[in-house]
Amino acid sequence: QVLDSPFPTGSAFGFSLRGAVDIDDNGYPDLIVGAYGANQVAVYRAQPVVKASVQLLVQDSLNPAVKSCVLPQTKTPVSCFKIQMCVGATGHNIPQKLSLNAELQLDRQKPRQGRRVLLLGSQQAGTTLNLDLGGKHSPICHTTMAFLRDEADIRDKLSPIVLSLNVSLPPTEAGMAPAVVLHGDTHVQEQTRIVLDCGEDDVCVPQLQLTASVTGSPLLVGADNVLELQMDTANEGEGAYEAELAVHLPQGAHYMRARSNVEGFERLICNQKKENETRVVLCELGNPMKKNTQIGIAMLVSVGNLEEAGESVSFQLQIRSKNSQNPNSKIVLLDVPVRAEAQVELRGNSFPASLVVAAEEGDREQNSLDSWGPKVEHTYELHNNGPGTVNGLHLSIHLPGQSQHSDLLYILDIQPQGGLQCFPQPPVNPLKVDWGLPTPSPSPVHPAHHKRDRRQIFLPEPEQPSRLQDPVLVSCDSAPCTVVQCDLQEMARGQRAMVTVLAFLWLPSLHQRPLDQFVLQSQAWFNVSSLPYAVPPLSLPRGEAQVRTQLLRALEERAIPIWWVLVGVLGGLLLLTILVLAMWKVGFFKRNRPPLEEDDEEGE
């Protein structure tokens, strides 16, 4: 014990000591300490010492199957046990009546909300008692009842249940020193445990087995990947307590949901937390996971942000328990390959899809405005459906025509969009035609030639064939060709690019074959040189498309001859005359009419 000086510094406190004097006659010697520098002394009175003895008694084990008590409020059967607390005190010249406070705590090593045993009466995890010791200070005992909570509410069944008892003096009034000093065994603790189904030695040794596979691979960079982890868990040994399946997720993976094949417990209880900066999904398998238990689990996991993942990602799986011996299964690693892929689509379209030109159309002077026929557009559109980005896209378009007078198509312009850079060979529009001028519509160029009234029909000229020819395919295989080469450095997911080839129908070329019909066909191919990722691609996109424009011919409409009309009119009059004569011959015009009502009245 250290005594601090009650006097100012330099008072020489402790220069002289005097003991063995009982100043207050309490049976304990007091101490006088002198301080000559202060011309004062300090008196320290000794207090009686109470030596306490505390005992806590509880049974060694608790059997959850034996439920001999009921809860007062709910009448629920519970497994209960007795707790006995005994407190005694001894000492020299201590007071005849001594009051002590005793505090009992149940399962004190667990958080208050997670304690496994509670008092039966109050359903609390602790209580405080006031114990009055008699004159002889003989030990007094107090017994209370406690109960074990339901197994479903208990997670930790392996660790011991610790109970503690602590005795202390009642608090005194402010500024007052206690009358006695409490010494001895003021704190004691005992422990009990939950009975386990672990054989004679009461030590459970599980044999946890885990196998796993994955569906949904490979993972694609840029895609919204969903994997299904299929895991088979089993315990071939004794019960595994607090058994759980631990799934360590790689970067970019996120837990979605999990289901088991156990009827009635399909929806697993799974929680995600961090362990050493790694996300881990923990799924409860049972407490305990009993012997010969088999559980199949299907877990859905989404995986994204794979640009820097490398050629594979790994899932680490293990069954863990809190058993002291052989608690865990072997670690299972699932490696899922990562690949790159992009689906690039090429579509072609013709506007208009078909043209109708009169048989004599094309009889125009070359290089005149009338030499220009309807406008024709061939459009090719590229669309990256993803999931990845592509680099080095090359598009090649082949069109039947080189802007020469002998071609059916006069190519005016190439119009790329979406970042494409295109270069035609040979150059287009060599005549420098101002294609912004109004152009004929896709219908026949001179509508007056095709005006028809009720007397007009299609009639060929006598010197021309009376039958149009079957359509002839005009492509780069059968005609001079213009090649358009287009390049795009990068094409992201969802991006579109388009090339429009603008051309006119060259009418003088049509006049050379007045009754021929044509199918104008262009064709395009594309390929991709690489994908901008460190992982190998499944394949490099490539494809082709065709665009066709039908060029149909119509024979000139001819007027109906006048003599045809006269013959028709005379024939009609002749038929009418014959019909009238036949009716007269049979007496149709001499028949008797029935009398009218007016005629009957006159006869009367």
UniProtKB/Swiss-Prot annotation:
Q: Which SMART domains match?
A: Int_alpha
**Where, subcellularly, is it found?**
Membrane
Q: Which UniProt keywords apply?
A: Calcium, Cell adhesion, Disulfide bond, Glycoprotein, Integrin, Membrane, Metal-binding, Receptor, Transmembrane, Transmembrane helix
Positions binding Ca(2+) in this chain are 22, 24, 26, 28, 30
Q: Which cysteines are joined by disulfide bonds?
A: 69-80, 86-141, 198-204, 270-283, 422-486, 476-481
Q: Does the keyword Disulfide bond apply?
A: yes
Q: Where are the transmembrane segments?
A: 559-584
Glycosylation positions?
Answer: 166, 276, 527
Supply one GO CC term from the record: external side of plasma membrane
Q: Which residues lie on this side of the membrane: Cytoplasmic?
A: 585-604
User: Highest taxon of the source?
Assistant: Eukaryota
Q: What is the name attached to this protein's record?
A: Integrin alpha-IIb
Gene that encodes the chain: ITGA2B
Q: What is its main location?
A: membrane
What biological process terms from GO does the record include?
angiogenesis; cell adhesion mediated by integrin; cell-cell adhesion; cell-matrix adhesion; integrin-mediated signaling pathway
Question: Membrane side Extracellular: which residues?
Answer: 1-558
Instruction: Name the InterPro entries on file.
Output: Int_alpha_beta-p (IPR013519), Integrin_alpha (IPR000413), Integrin_alpha_C_CS (IPR018184), Integrin_alpha_Ig-like_1 (IPR013649), Integrin_alpha_Ig-like_2 (IPR048285), Integrin_alpha_Ig-like_3 (IPR048286), Integrin_alpha_N (IPR028994), Integrin_dom_sf (IPR032695)
Specify the protein's topology with respect to the membrane: Single-pass type I membrane protein
Q: How does it assemble?
A: Heterodimer of an alpha and a beta subunit. The alpha subunit is composed of a heavy and a light chain linked by a disulfide bond. Alpha-IIb associates with beta-3. Directly interacts with RNF181. Interacts (via C-terminus cytoplasmic tail region) with CIB1; the interaction is direct and calcium-dependent. Interacts (via C-terminus cytoplasmic tail region) with CIB2, CIB3 and CIB4; the interactions are stabilized/increased in a calcium and magnesium-dependent manner.
Q: Cross-referenced Gene3D superfamilies, in alphabetical order?
A: Bicelle-embedded integrin alpha(iib) transmembrane segment, Integrin alpha, N-terminal, Integrin domains. Chain A, domain 2, ntegrin, alpha v. Chain A, domain 3, ntegrin, alpha v. Chain A, domain 4
Q: Which GO terms describe its molecular function?
A: integrin binding; metal ion binding
Q: Where is this motif: GFFKR motif?
A: 587-591
The family note in this entry says: Belongs to the integrin alpha chain family.
Q: Which organism is it from?
A: Papio cynocephalus
